[in-house]
Curated annotation (Swiss-Prot):
The keyword Metal-binding applies. Binds 4 Cu cations per monomer. Cu cation 2 binds at residues 102, 145, 532. Present with 589 molecules/cell in log phase SD medium. It comes from the Eukaryota. It comes from Saccharomyces cerevisiae (strain ATCC 204508 / S288c). Its cofactor is Cu cation. The keyword Thylakoid does not apply. This is Putative multicopper oxidase GMC1. It is an enzyme of class 1 (oxidoreductase). GO terms for biological process: cellular response to iron ion starvation; meiotic cell cycle; reductive iron assimilation; synaptonemal complex organization. One of its GO terms (cellular component) is fungal-type vacuole membrane. Keywords: Copper, Ion transport, Iron, Iron transport, Meiosis, Metal-binding, Oxidoreductase, Repeat, Transport. Cu cation 3 binds at residues 147, 457, 530.
Length: 608
């Protein structure tokens, strides 16, 4: 075999070519999307918001890959010109809009989609560009929705999927570990040490998206005006139904391929209020992802989702499976709205019960109202992303409750939720201030009897401790009581098991209870921490915290593209696409090539 050695003068040129090829390969695709939001009416004369003509109370699915750039232009036609010009603040808020990309972290603050805080409001007839690059570390199931008034329950929402090789490998490795097991037991899946030898595409895997939501027969703005913000308004208007994939009907079917061996279900609770319960009759659910975080595969029979939460589950089908009954319970004030849908294999003979009434949500196998914060654990790779320190520099405690005393009603015109005696609008004016790149424990104490779903913007959090209903508030200087005891027990559990705390962006906090969440403040800007029940948000239940920018690490504020175009059409030639921060994988490849070139050069000189 003839060996061709490179001359030294060839090495720099070869190196430049190879590095250019690598960087070009790492640059993702650019997706240019245009969303036109307008109001439409359903056959039932119910006013909804439609994005690009979609009428199922959900907008188009966005599907990208890690490292891709998204250029999304949103134009607002939600209200008529006459409605948009009304003096009422309630109308002004509803007639303006913005988009929040729920759970996408990291993302520069100017693209967080909070009108009047992180961006200008998008008024009637105006357009706004969201131009950013998905970070290489971001992967999984997310969703987008309006953060203006109560728009998203009317249809201003959709699913955002970020694909990546690590995700596909995680699914394939899990399949490799369970494919020869006849009966799957609840709990952590024992993963095979040998990695999968097949690509994910070699298996018969069918992916389906399942969106779950509550539903109100009346227009949300009417409900907000008449039943929530009035002087006698309450906190939780009764919803009338539920939606699965935007449909209110029961007994619908979802077709899958005849040769399907595994179902991969991305489930999103995109509702305004109700916790959702999900179950597949006779099948185990292998949980692979929670809120965009890949987890060590964990098997359950029934799972619940707080508003804003997402799970990806893998389902191993049986050889004789023709159809699967899907059971969904949408939690209302007293009980559940129960629906049953069916997955069926193409070509299968269907003889389905028309209106089966043998389901009690609370008697489903494995049913629990509790969060799986102790059970599920991020993969080793995911845990490295959250660079929290062992000991926080400070603990911030936030107590919230509902106030309907006369002084509150006189000041706000209605009863309001307050966090540490302040409403959300007051935190907008005067945020809680954190240091940059510091680790904090945030304690959220519910002095309210109801369960509340909380969501954090801009950061993931670790769940250090989570109380049960009735445990009471946790205060670090009160070292007694149920809350203190549970907190200590959770710390001992983490120390004894060596488990990493679960990482999420959304969580349910039980009534008269608490949560201790640990964050590292890496992203500068003003960020929200709020209840994701839309009515509660309108009633003041949330805070704003601010992370400062530092001169020595100012690039942290621009891990994504930084240009946006409020109200005016941009010149396409001037749109800047800034790549995400360089990832370790690229560095390793580049170093490897440098070493190989150096070895080649040494080899050449030795043989001269």
């Amino acid at each position: 075999m003839k060996v061709i050695l490179l001359k030294p003068v060839q090495l720099p040129m070869l190196l430049l070519i190879l590095l250019k090829f690598i960087m070009a390969a790492k640059e993702g695709k650019i997706h240019v999307l245009e969303f036109n939001a307008s109001s439409e009416y359903t056959l039932d004369k119910r006013r909804v918001i439609s994005i690009n003509g979609y009428s199922a109370t959900f907008g188009p699915e966005i599907r990208v890959k890690s490292g891709d750039t998204l250029n999304l232009k949103l134009t607002n036609w939600i209200c008529s010109e006459e409605e948009a010009s009304k003096d009422s603040d309630v109308w002004k808020d509803y007639c303006s809009t913005a988009l929040h990309f729920h759970g996408v972290v990291p993302l520069a603050n100017e693209f967080d989609g909070i009108p009047g805080l992180t961006q200008p409001t998008i008024g009637y007839g105006e357009s706004y560009w969201y131009n950013f690059t998905i970070d290489q570390s971001t992967c999984g199931t997310f969703w987008y929705h309006s953060h203006s008034s109560v728009q998203y329950g009317d249809g201003m929402r959709g699913v955002l999927i970020v694909e990546c090789d690590d995700y596909d490998n995680h699914v394939a490795n899990t399949i490799n570990s369970v494919r020869d097991i006849e009966t799957l037991d609840d709990g952590v899946v024992t993963m095979k040490k040998d990695k999968h030898t097949k690509e994910l595409t070699d298996y018969e895997v069918q992916e389906r998206i399942i969106t779950l939501s509550d539903w109100y027969t009346n227009w949300n703005l009417d409900i907000l005006n008449d039943k929530v913000l009035s002087s006698t308004g309450g906190t939780d208007p009764k919803f009338d139904g539920s939606l699965i994939n935007g449909k209110s009907s029961d007994g619908e079917t979802i077709k899958i391929g005849f040769n399907t061996e595994y179902l991969l279900l991305r489930i999103v609770n995109s509702g305004m209020s109700g916790t959702q319960v999900f179950h597949l009759d006779g099948f185990q659910l292998i949980v692979l992802e929670a809120d965009g975080i890949m987890i060590k595969p964990f098997i359950v029979q029934t799972i619940n989702l707080a508003v804003g939460q997402r799970y990806t589950i893998l389902v191993k089908l049986k050889s004789d499976t023709s159809f699967i009954r899907m059971i969904n319970g949408c939690n209302k004030m007293m009980g559940y709205i129960t629906k049953q849908w069916w997955f069926y294999k193409e070509g299968a003979h269907l003889d389905l019960p028309k209106n089966p009434n043998d389901v009690s949500i609370e008697h489903l196998p494995g049913f629990t109202k509790a969060e799986l914060y102790r059970d599920i654990e991020p993969t080793q790779e995911e845990n490295k992303k959250l660079r929290t320190k062992a000991d926080p520099v400070a603990v911030f405690e936030f107590d919230y409750a509902y106030y309907k005393d006369e002084s509150t009603k006189q000041k706000y015109g209605t009863g309001m939720y307050k966090v540490n005696e302040r409403t959300f609008s007051e935190y907008v004016k005067d945020p809680v201030r954190f240091g940059f790149n510091e680790t904090y424990d945030i304690v959220i104490n519910s002095l309210d009897h109801m369960r509340h779903p909380w969501h954090m913007h801009g950061h993931h959090f670790q769940i250090i401790s989570l109380g049960n209903k009735g445990d009471g508030p946790f205060h670090k200087d009160v070292q007694e009581g149920k809350a203190w005891s549970r907190y200590q027990n959770d710390l001992r559990h983490l120390a004894r098991t060596g488990k990493a705390p679960m990482v999420r962006d959304s969580i349910n906090i039980a009534g008269n209870s608490y949560a201790v969440l640990r964050i590292n403040t890496e992203m500068p800007g003003k960020w929200l921490l709020h209840c994701h029940v839309e009515w509660h948000m309108m009633k003041g239940l949330g805070i704003v915290f601010e992370v400062p920018t530092t001169t020595e690490d100012s690039t942290k504020q621009a891990t994504t593209a930084v240009l946006s175009y409020p109200t005016k059409e941009p010149d396409p030639n001037t749109v800047v696409h800034t790549a995400a921060l360089e990832q370790n994988k690229s560095k390793v490849i580049a170093v490897y090539i440098l070493i190989m070139c150096a070895v080649d050069a040494i080899f050449y000189w030795l043989l001269m």
